[in-house]
Design a protein with these regions (language model features):
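Conserved catalytic submotifs in the C-terminal HATPase_c
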Residues: 84, 109-119, 154
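A conserved beta-strand-to-alpha-helix junction within the catalytic ATP-binding
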Residues: 84-97
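Short beta-strand/loop element within the Bergerat-fold HATPase_c
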Residues: 146-156
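Short conserved segment of the HATPase_c
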Residues: 166-178
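Short alpha-helical Gxxx[C/S/T] motif in the catalytic ATP-binding
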Residues: 191, 195
Length: 223
């Protein structure tokens, strides 16, 4: 019992630390971006322009990491979700549309199969959008050039893509907090763990299957 209490206390302290760190980083990052915008308007040599471009890129990465940490701290704070009757088909369509530019840039032509009729569920709209966005973002990040999204009439959604850089071990850890497939500092490894936490809080489930270099992530929303 003491061990459990110690674990819960440690987990609470970790969440508080993440919240504080992400919050403290947001203000200086906003200031840095402001100064970079001002410098972009000044005349400068090609070398200085190159340096500024690198600084901007790394600042954007840090900003994205900070925002992801902040979102994670919000999700794990167990703020009350607000279920409402919503069309899951439309929510998925909107999420896919928001990634259209990224897909174009990567040369990915997604194969999409959605029900013609709406699929209504009592869900938190913001949480559903976050779930879809995190899964699509992850799929595009590690895809070898393809993406398939299929939803059946019961609202079960399957995201599939070829991913030669994965294996059964990495797939088994995809939903772990802070786990990243690559030893990269460009990701916190929280995207899929946030998706899992949110969907389970709404009574649904999520899982991953890896077979013949194909990754499938399937989510089922509670009826």
């Amino acid at each position: 019992r003491k061990e459990r209490h110690r674990y819960q206390q440690g987990d609470l302290e970790l969440k508080e630390a993440i919240t504080n760190i992400s919050h403290d980083l947001r203000t200086p990052l906003t200031a840095i971006n402001g100064y970079l915008d001002l410098l972009e308007r000044e005349e400068k040599s090609e070398t200085v322009h190159c340096y500024l471009s690198q600084i901007q890129n790394r600042t954007d990465v840090l900003k994205n990491l900070t925002e992801e940490l902040f979102r994670y701290s919000v999700v794990t704070s167990f703020q009350e979700l607000k279920p409402e009757r919503m069309d899951v088909v439309r929510a998925l369509e909107e999420s896919l549309l928001s990634f259209y530019a990224v897909m174009q840039e990567k040369g990915i032509q997604p194969e999409i199969e959605l029900p013609e009729e709406p699929v209504f569920r009592e869900l938190d709209a913001g949480a559903v959008n976050r779930i879809f966005s995190n899964i699509i973002s992850n799929a595009l990040k590690y895809s070898d050039g393809d993406l398939s999204v299929v939803m059946d009439k019961n609202g079960c959604v399957t995201f599939s893509n070829t991913a030669h850089n994965l294996n059964y071990v990495t797939v088994g850890r995809l939903f772990d907090r802070f786990y990243t497939v690559e030893a990269s500092r460009n990701s916190t490894g929280l995207g899929l763990s946030i998706a899992k936490l949110l969907i389970e809080r709404m009574g649904g489930s999520i899982g991953a299957i890896y077979n013949n270099d194909k990754l499938q992530i399937k989510i089922i929303f509670a009826k």
